[in-house]
């Protein structure tokens, strides 16, 4: 399937980033922000060829004159007109393909409303004339990418986190838990605690700088209290960061205080269990006979699990919650930022999967509800 002329397309639509490419590839070819920007003011320069909307990186670079919107909130599509623009941009500008010539595999958040899957299906067949399509659950794809069919996936991106127990390739919906705490919240919290230190970050442009600081310098402490006292008594944990204007700032305990809120959401003023406890609660909602398999196959996925130290901390916290003799294994694949996409690439290129596609003909006969019968 490495022939681009017939290869299936794989599109993973996240709250923060779209990952798109061809089935059979080992990484997405296009990764760009899930944003649509519209000009705030009427164009004054005649003949400048100003567009009525911009998508992705172009919207990001012109953000000074645009109003930016994210059509995917907390992993779920809330604005279909903008979503259509993002898909159009993906096909024609990023991948440069004719959508009517390629089957397309889309991803969806766990517990995505039924109406949403139908709408996705409808847009693919009616707007883009896809020959075939399929909708797969993001966490299930991450598990496939790790070479497993049973396990529990903790998937955390920019807009939402989920714990998804999966048995023999099927997600167990009654045990899926959602946590509205993810990358964007960590960036906001880092902005807040850096502001308390006297550095001012307020605009959306400055938020991007803070996101970069987060990605480059933050880590998860194995023992938070001990790390705090180390940070207070010496400067060994301090790192410097150069802002775009050349000013250099120093960041100390903020490096691990921001990601700590994954384990202690009370830092963000949220009354919710941390990611370790949510994972444990999710396992406890499953049948007692499969828990052992879940503990031994806990897979991390998504950009917000990229912090150094997160796997060791997760191991420590879940060990403390689980029965004393239980074998616990946290799997943190190095490519986990893109593991949903990679899993989609693997799935769409399997010979056994080819009969699973929803074809245009099936859609014409049954309508959008076909998606519930063929994709689960």
Swiss-Prot record:
PROSITE patterns: ACTINS_1, ACTINS_2, ACTINS_ACT_LIKE
Annotated SUPFAM superfamilies: Actin-like ATPase domain
Alphabetized GO MF terms: ATP binding; hydrolase activity
Tagged with keyword Cytoplasm: yes
Keyword NAD: no
Reaction catalyzed: ATP + H2O = ADP + phosphate + H(+)
GO cellular component: cytoplasm; cytoskeleton
Signal peptide positions (record): none
EC number(s) on file: 3.6.4.-
EC category name: hydrolase
Main localization (coarse): cytoplasm
Record key words, sorted: Acetylation, ATP-binding, Cytoplasm, Cytoskeleton, Hydrolase, Nucleotide-binding
Localization in the cell: Cytoplasm, Cytoskeleton
UniProt-listed Pfam families: Actin
Protein task: Actins are highly conserved proteins that are involved in various types of cell motility and are ubiquitously expressed in all eukaryotic cells.
Alphabetical list of PANTHER family matching this protein: ACTIN
Family affiliation: Belongs to the actin family.
Protein name per the record: Actin CyI, cytoplasmic
Organism, scientific name: Heliocidaris erythrogramma
